[in-house]
């Protein structure tokens, strides 16, 4: 067990903090490529100091919200996409832990990491509906650009502490890229 200083300077034991329940979304186009956005870094957030900033959409599940509903809400809030159809839901939740220097700081200092339920969708719309900066509905922009990426490349594009999550997600949904 190792402790780290939180935002107040008090020591924070990661084991004492819960995982934040979240959803993750792999959106594939008709060519089997995956949508990835380059994160805008906010000082003190989980991406602060990172150079590998490409990620798929993800976000928190609101209290009482169904994960499938949360996935569609997060997708719209972050990308503006609505023209999607569900391909598959991962059977298991996937956890990641924040690196020690971010425990007690990132994720509002309340979580040790995230537990994520992943969904794969097919994008069936026109790319003109994709809006990231600004995204629709007055939501805060999380990405400054986006691209369709080969699925196999994703683990090497994400911040290192999320790499194992992306390796599991790619393994789960690999058959959908064919």
UniProtKB/Swiss-Prot annotation:
Coiled-coil stretches noted in the UniProt entry, renumbered to this chain: none
- The answer to whether keyword Hydrolase applies is yes
**What are this entry's molecular-function GO terms?**
bis(5'-adenosyl)-pentaphosphatase activity; guanosine-3',5'-bis(diphosphate) 3'-diphosphatase activity
For this UniProt record, the keywords arranged alphabetically read as follows: Hydrolase
Cofactor(s) for this UniProt protein: a divalent metal cation
Short name of one Pfam family for this protein? NUDIX
Alphabetical GO biological process terms: nucleoside phosphate metabolic process; ribose phosphate metabolic process
Gene3D superfamilies assigned: Nucleoside Triphosphate Pyrophosphohydrolase
Please state every residue range assigned to the domain named Nudix hydrolase: 18-171
Q: What is its EC number?
A: 3.6.1.-
Task: Name the SUPFAM superfamilies on file.
Answer: Nudix
The free-text function statement in the UniProt record for this protein reads: Accelerates the degradation of transcripts by removing pyrophosphate from the 5'-end of triphosphorylated RNA, leading to a more labile monophosphorylated state that can stimulate subsequent ribonuclease cleavage.
Hey, which family's this protein in?
A: Belongs to the Nudix hydrolase family. RppH subfamily.
Q: What PANTHER family does its record include? A: NUDIX HYDROLASE 26, CHLOROPLASTIC, UDP/ADP-SUGAR PYROPHOSPHATASE
Q: What is this protein called?
A: RNA pyrophosphohydrolase
Organism for this UniProt entry: Brucella melitensis biotype 2 (strain ATCC 23457)
- The encoding gene is rppH
């Amino acid at each position: 067990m190792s402790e780290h200083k939180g935002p107040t300077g008090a020591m924070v034991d990661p084991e004492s903090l819960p995982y934040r329940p979240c959803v993750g979304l792999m959106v594939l186009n008709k060519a089997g490529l995956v949508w990835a956005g380059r994160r805008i870094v906010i000082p003190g957030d989980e991406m602060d100091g990172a150079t590998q900033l490409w990620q798929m959409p993800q976000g928190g599940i609101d209290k009482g919200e169904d994960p499938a509903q949360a996935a569609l809400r997060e997708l719209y809030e972050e990308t503006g996409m609505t023209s999607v159809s569900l391909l598959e839901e991962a059977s298991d939740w996937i956890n990641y832990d924040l690196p020690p220097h971010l425990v007690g700081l990132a994720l509002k200092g309340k979580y040790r990491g995230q537990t994520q339920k992943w969904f794969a969708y097919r994008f069936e719309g026109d790319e003109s509906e994709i809006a990231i900066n600004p995204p629709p509905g007055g939501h805060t922009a999380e990405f400054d650009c986006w691209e369709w990426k080969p699925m196999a490349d994703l683990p090497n594009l994400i911040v290192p502490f999320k790499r194992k999550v992306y390796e599991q997600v790619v393994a789960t949904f690999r058959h959908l890229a064919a």
